[in-house]
Every structure is written in structure tokens, then in C-alpha cells.
């Protein structure tokens, strides 16, 4: 991949771990000379999600098409996970036509994010993506992990869906549900730590 150095283990951003969990990993992806062409971020957060991945060369964050059709009002989001954050935290910054990994001074450790979103659509062809899933007025319900810090042992968590203030559920309307799990919660800003690893064993919405 354009001379980018990738660690041998783990082998990719989302792989099956030895215990059967999904291992989701952030990479500092740089060429041998320490910077990348502008189309290749210097920091890439691993993301496991419901939806479709379709490469968008002009906007990497729009490659993740979040959401699947969902026909009822969700109440709870349950998951089992553990997390090993990397350090230090870097951000991919463009300079002189290249992307560089720049140290983020005010963040010592990375954090993960696990969240579920119910959003309204006029057509099931509509999706949200990495640029707008956390800001879109279409999202009416959201359930999320509140503590994205290190967890050495698996945690069983159940969180409630809460209204976002963008309207209430209406059974006559169309909705899609997006579950998004990432090893770097600031990944939509191309920010994270090399080899931060989120392990997810179980996901359920009820």
C-alpha cells in the first residue's frame, strides 16, 4: 500500500483475536520517510460498524456508510469489551502537501468509543458517515459508552438509548441503526495512538 509500513501483528485494523473477539486497532501509518501523500492519513483508527465500506478517495471519513434498516424503537445497548490504549497520541496534520503524525500535547492516552445511533431517513439508501454521525440532526436516539479509558479485563456493559433532542420516535417513519466501535474516539479527527486495541466480544440492541 504505497510503501506504508504496517506492523505484522495485529495484521489489520479489524481482525479476529485468539479468544474469538473482534480486535480493532489504530495504526500510525507512515511511509519510510516519515510522511504520507495527502490522501493517506498518518493516523488511522480501526472501526467496526454496521453498514457498508465504500472507498471515497476525496474524503476518507465518507468511506464508512453507517446504518442498517431498523423498524422498532430501541431501548438498551449491551456489549462486552476490553481496551488497551496506546501512547502517545498523534494527529495526522497536512503540511507541505504531505500528512505528518504530530504529537498531541494535551492527551497522554488514547480512548475508545462504542456507540449506537438510531437515525431517521426518507429512503433506506441514505446513510451517515464519519463526518456527521456525531453531529447529524437525523439522529434521534443514541446509546454510548461513557468511559473510554483502559480496561484490562472484559467488561459487560448495558446502556440506555437517550433522546438527542432531534425529535421523538414515530413508528410511521423510516429509521436506520448504526453501531460504531472504534479504537480511537478522536479518529474522526485523524487522532489516536499507534496500536490502541479495542476487543469486542458481544453486541446487542433491544
Put a short name on every predicted segment:
Residues 81-105:
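Short amphipathic, basic-aromatic surface patches that mediate peripheral association
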Amino acid at each position: 500500500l504505497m510503501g506504508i509500513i504496517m506492523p505484522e501483528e495485529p495484521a489489520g485494523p479489524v481482525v479476529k483475536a485468539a479468544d474469538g473477539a473482534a480486535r480493532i486497532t489504530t495504526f500510525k501509518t507512515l511511509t519510510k520517510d516519515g510522511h504520507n501523500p495527502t490522501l493517506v492519513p498518518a493516523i488511522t483508527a480501526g472501526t467496526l460498524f454496521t453498514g457498508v465500506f465504500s472507498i471515497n478517495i476525496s474524503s476518507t471519513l465518507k468511506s464508512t456508510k453507517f446504518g442498517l434498516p431498523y423498524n422498532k424503537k430501541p431501548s438498551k445497548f449491551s456489549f462486552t469489551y476490553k481496551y488497551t490504549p496506546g501512547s502517545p497520541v498523534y494527529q495526522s496534520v497536512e503540511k507541505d502537501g504531505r500528512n505528518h503524525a504530530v504529537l498531541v500535547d494535551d492527551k497522554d492516552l488514547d480512548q475508545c468509543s462504542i456507540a449506537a445511533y438510531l437515525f431517521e431517513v426518507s429512503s433506506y439508501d441514505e446513510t451517515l458517515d464519519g463526518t456527521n454521525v456525531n453531529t447529524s440532526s437525523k439522529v434521534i436516539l443514541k446509546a454510548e459508552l461513557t468511559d473510554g479509558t483502559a480496561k484490562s479485563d472484559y467488561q459487560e456493559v448495558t446502556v440506555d438509548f437517550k433522546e438527542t433532542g432531534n425529535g421523538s420516535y414515530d413508528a410511521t417513519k423510516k429509521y436506520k441503526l448504526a453501531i460504531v466501535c472504534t479504537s480511537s474516539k478522536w479518529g474522526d479527527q485523524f487522532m489516536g495512538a499507534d496500536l490502541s486495541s479495542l476487543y469486542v466480544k458481544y453486541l446487542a440492541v433491544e
